[in-house]
Amino acid sequence: MDYDFKVKLSSERERVEDLFEYEGCKVGRGTYGHVYKAKRKDGKDDKDYALKQIEGTGISMSACREIALLRELKHPNVISLLKVFLSHADRKVWLLFDYAEHDLWHIIKFHRASKANKKPVQLPRGMVKSLLYQILDGIHYLHANWVLHRDLKPANILVMGEGPERGRVKIADMGFARLFNSPLKPLADLDPVVVTFWYRAPELLLGARHYTKAIDIWAIGCIFAELLTSEPIFHCRQEDIKTSNPYHHDQLDRIFNVMGFPADKDWEDIKKMPEHSTLMKDFRRNTYTNCSLIKYMEKHKVKPDSKAFHLLQKLLTMDPIKRITSEQAMQDPYFLEDPLPTSDVFAGCQIPYPKREFLTEEEPDEKGDKKTQQQQQGNNHTNGTGHPGNQDSGHAQGPPLKKVRVVPPTTTSGGLIMTSDYQRSNPHAAYPNPGPSTSQPQSSMGYSATSQQPPQYSHQTHRY
């Protein structure tokens, strides 16, 4: 390239430090890099933005995948990539996003902490329904455009704070997303270990080579159960497995302890799973005779004859072929009964959740991790399984994930899916304050999480 042209191009390239004020406003940190809450220096608007600085120099395959997809995908419930900055001096990459003040990881944590403080505050029924509907709407859009998210978990479900998009769900962290319209090889051959353990579908744990959109639906079912109970439904001891083998005994054991062991008639193709022989060697069906989703949810006061439970059953169907689709789920009777889903998940009432706090440069995001994990494992008494400690966000609470190549997606013949219209309900009374909860720096928008958790559960770190 001509030297003079390079100099001219460099002088004209916009620099993130010239456009945005973000010093001292770090809200997330992890192996992927750093995330800052930022404002425009020129004062053209008063909006908050999220600046994600990618760790290292150049662009990783994961970052390339995320950028390629986000440049093509446009939907109210999928996070918007506004701009990409390339720093010529230090070869750093910056991604500019809309700023979301909340995420489901912190929202659920808030309600779990209220239970621990003996002042339980349940997530309002209408809020749970609105959250689920918008998650399904965003995933339906991705699936209609041939994209699997593959890493759905509460940390990657953002919720906008005060502003024009108040209470709007944003699905974030497309770093593990993949196109599935015409893969050159089965997806499992490229990277068999995907999705955070607790939200991983049973067919993944059994080594399925041709997994489908159903893996995202299972993860949504896990999130739905967590919204209803304030506890992760399939929490399990987390091991740092240095292998690409997707089989995970303890995670399967936890699923069977909740759901029961699948009958042959309920999942006929289970015998075709690569790890079926290992499954039959490690497990005995009669061990889980008294286990069922009905019994588990009844313990959390979710009635088996409720429409919410019926939808949960369809989302958490063991057989991926029989599992409901996002489009079918959005048409479920659950969403037709009062309270109806709203575009503002807070339904116009006061937002009780604290805003994110800034991290200091010296303050580690994983502060107190080991101590917390040891305490939790010491107190463990759930079906013989422990609880995972925080993993760095690059590993997303599971074995290392292989990076794979991806190209920008093509839209379906009808173009991009349009957003759904939401019915708006009248504002409800403000949420009661559950009293003091754990105080810690807030992580943000799929960014790296802090480690001090309410009792029982150390959760995954998260990224934008």
Curated annotation (Swiss-Prot):
Superkingdom assignment: Eukaryota
Keywords, comma-separated and alphabetical: Activator, ATP-binding, Kinase, Nucleotide-binding, Nucleus, Repressor, Serine/threonine-protein kinase, Transcription, Transcription regulation, Transferase
Molecular function GO labels: ATP binding; cyclin-dependent protein serine/threonine kinase activity; protein kinase activity; protein serine kinase activity; RNA polymerase II CTD heptapeptide repeat kinase activity; ubiquitin protein ligase activity
Gene that encodes it: Cdk8
Lineage, uppermost ranks: Eukaryota, Metazoa, Chordata, Craniata, Vertebrata
CDD domains: STKc_CDK8
Region (Interaction with CCNC): 1-15
Protein name: Cyclin-dependent kinase 8
Biological process, per Gene Ontology: negative regulation of triglyceride metabolic process; positive regulation of transcription by RNA polymerase II; protein ubiquitination
Active site: 151
Keyword Repressor: yes
Region annotation Disordered: where it falls in the sequence: 358-464
Entry's Gene Ontology cellular component terms: CKM complex; mediator complex; nucleolus; nucleoplasm; nucleus; protein-containing complex; ubiquitin ligase complex
Catalytic activities: L-seryl-[protein] + ATP = O-phospho-L-seryl-[protein] + ADP + H(+); L-threonyl-[protein] + ATP = O-phospho-L-threonyl-[protein] + ADP + H(+); [DNA-directed RNA polymerase] + ATP = phospho-[DNA-directed RNA polymerase] + ADP + H(+)
Low complexity compositional bias, start-end: 373-391
Cofactor(s) needed: Mg(2+)
Protein family per UniProt: Belongs to the protein kinase superfamily. CMGC Ser/Thr protein kinase family. CDC2/CDKX subfamily.
EC number, UniProt record: 2.7.11.22, 2.7.11.23
Class in the EC hierarchy, top level: transferase
InterPro entries from the UniProt entry: CDK (IPR050108), Kinase-like_dom_sf (IPR011009), Prot_kinase_dom (IPR000719), Protein_kinase_ATP_BS (IPR017441), Ser/Thr_kinase_AS (IPR008271)
Binding site for ATP: 27-35, 52
